[in-house]
């Protein structure tokens, strides 16, 4: 294993693999990525994968624009499908105030060059008969939005990074960062599996790196403690429900109809999208509990929290 690198990326989720890929694509030689478990095993693998083109921030919208165009090139470059579905995004409104809010969205979208379309309840019902429009005032539709499979896009970026010379090492945990004044001395411990838990072994190495980038997700507070910093990044519990196949939806798609857009109802506080003949329903929760303020337990790996439906009733 290499012990001297130009850039060391810590964390093998969607963010870490993207950083490693882009450094190598920009011409950086000698880049290494470390992941303490398996790629995507942290906060990446179970994300809903919503990928909006439009955002109320001008700068963020341009980042989204780059990302969407980039994801479309990954399969041609790596041979791996990133699971990107451009189905559109329908933001529905139950009140006049919400429609006024969407007018602001529209002006921002025009500034950023993002296409949009206004739809009345009747037009929504004509296009998507399964959508209940009885309480709607209208909607703004963004045809270039969609969703992506987080695990698939991470694996595609990891392969692309390797193709550009990045070395990816799994089962290595960073346990210390020391800045010498000219480079970083990064203490790494080999992780082993015992009884379903991921535990540190006695094998350690020190990697010398000119640059270190941390993308540790759920482990951000541990990273901050190792660096002597305070990072305002705390994982917050989010839940979504994946339904069984919906007979009405299955019949709709069997007739050759297109996939529904991502449906967002800010007044009802839900987003919905299709998933394998059924639906993913995600609530916009208030006061969702924070997690891992003091570190991630050894027993928590690619796991889910217990469902708490009472919190979203």
Regions found by a protein language model. Name each.
Residues 141-211, 219:
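Helical element adjacent to the flavin cofactor pocket in flavoenzyme catalytic cores
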């Amino acid at each position: 294993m290499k012990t001297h690198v130009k850039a060391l990326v810590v964390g093998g989720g969607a963010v870490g693999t993207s950083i490693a890929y882009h450094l190598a694509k920009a011409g950086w030689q000698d880049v290494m990525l470390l992941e303490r478990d398996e790629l995507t095993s942290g906060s990446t693998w179970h994300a809903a994968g919503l990928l909006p083109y439009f955002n109320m921030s001008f700068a963020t919208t341009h980042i989204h624009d780059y990302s969407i165009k980039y994801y479309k090139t990954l399969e041609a470059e790596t041979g791996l499908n990133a699971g990107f579905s451009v189905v559109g995004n329908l933001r529905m409104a139950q009140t006049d105030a919400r429609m006024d809010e969407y007018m602001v969205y529209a002006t921002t979208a025009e500034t950023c060059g993002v296409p949009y379309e206004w739809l009345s309840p009747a037009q929504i019902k004509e296009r998507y008969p399964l959508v209940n429009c009885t309480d709607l005032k209208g909607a703004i539709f963004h045809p270039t939005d969609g969703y992506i499979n987080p695990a698939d896009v991470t694996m595609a970026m990891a392969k692309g990074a390797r193709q550009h010379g990045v070395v990816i090492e799994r089962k290595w945990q960073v346990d210390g960062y020391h800045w010498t004044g000219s480079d970083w001395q990064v203490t790494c411990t080999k992780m082993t599996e015992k009884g379903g838990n991921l535990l540190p072994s006695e094998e350690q190495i020190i990697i010398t790196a000119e640059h270190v980038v941390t993308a540790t997700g759920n482990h951000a507070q541990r990273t901050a403690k190792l660096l002597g910093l305070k990072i305002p990044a705390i994982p917050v519990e989010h839940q979504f429900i994946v339904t069984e196949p919906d007979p009405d939806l299955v019949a709709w798609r069997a007739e050759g109809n297109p996939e529904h857009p991502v449906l967002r109802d800010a007044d009802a506080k839900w987003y919905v999208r299709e998933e394998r003949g059924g639906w993913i329903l995600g609530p916009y929760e208030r006061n969702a509990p924070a997690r891992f303020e003091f570190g991630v337990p050894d027993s928590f790996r690619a796991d889910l929290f217990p469902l708490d439906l009472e919190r979203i009733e």
